[in-house]
Regions:
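Catalytic center-proximal scaffold of phosphoryl-transfer enzymes
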Residues: 1-206
Length: 206
């Protein structure tokens, strides 16, 4: 990660799945809630734990609240809504710990380890889990990042590989440029037309 020189230079919010090496970087963090929903559903449905189902519902409700506020032209949740989300979140995590006390070392089943590890992450990094509720620039999940690399994997699946490293770099540059335009609500065809006319569109500050 250091060699790529991306995370160390960023000044925004790093949205990730909680992988510990990311914590070594001095940036604000947000955790991907698509991952949390999958894990909570696995615990709630697979092991019949109501707190997990309720917490998954709360995260979805918080997402809807943010979307409604954004649609209304707001850039924040009202204090009462935000307080309610935080209080209920804490109560559900506490219920989770009550149902899943820390297992004894050497006597942990696969389920116990997964459930307790999930609860620890949700508890210790609750501000990062809920960052999308306090900063509307932060998405609910990092699925967009995964979608950005999907075409690379699709190209590999169809063609096997690129014939040259230069070709791979050109492919990634084009996909990155198109993705950046979409994120800034720039019409892709119009942007590409400008590019071929020598009028390169770049995001503000680039």
């Amino acid at each position: 990660m250091d060699d790529l020189g991306v995370i160390g230079k960023m000044a925004g919010v790093a949205i990730h799945d909680g992988w510990k090496p990311y914590r070594h970087y001095d940036v604000d963090h947000a955790l991907c809630n698509a991952h949390h929903l999958r894990e909570l559903i696995a615990v709630g449905v697979g092991w019949d734990q109501g707190w997990a189902n309720d917490l998954a519902d709360l995260l979805r409700e918080a997402k809807r609240s943010v979307e409604a506020a954004r649609t209304a032209g707001l850039d924040h949740l009202d204090a009462a809504t935000l307080h309610s989300i935080r209080v209920r979140y804490g109560q559900l995590v506490a219920k989770g710990f009550a149902a899943n006390p820390e297992p004894d070392v050497g006597k942990r089943s696969g389920y116990e380890k997964k459930a307790f590890s999930l609860l620890k992450r949700l508890d210790q990094h609750r501000a990062d889990v809920l960052r999308f509720t306090t900063n509307f620039a932060v998405p609910f999940d990092n699925n967009q990042a995964e979608r950005d690399i999907r075409m690379v994997k699709l190209q590999q699946k169809i063609s096997g590989s690129w014939r040259t490293l230069a070709g791979a770099r050109h492919f990634c540059a084009i996909r990155s440029y198109v993705s950046t335009m979409r994120k800034h609500d720039v019409d892709v065809l119009a942007g590409l037309r400008l590019l071929f006319e020598g009028q390169v569109w770049l995001p503000a500050g680039a």
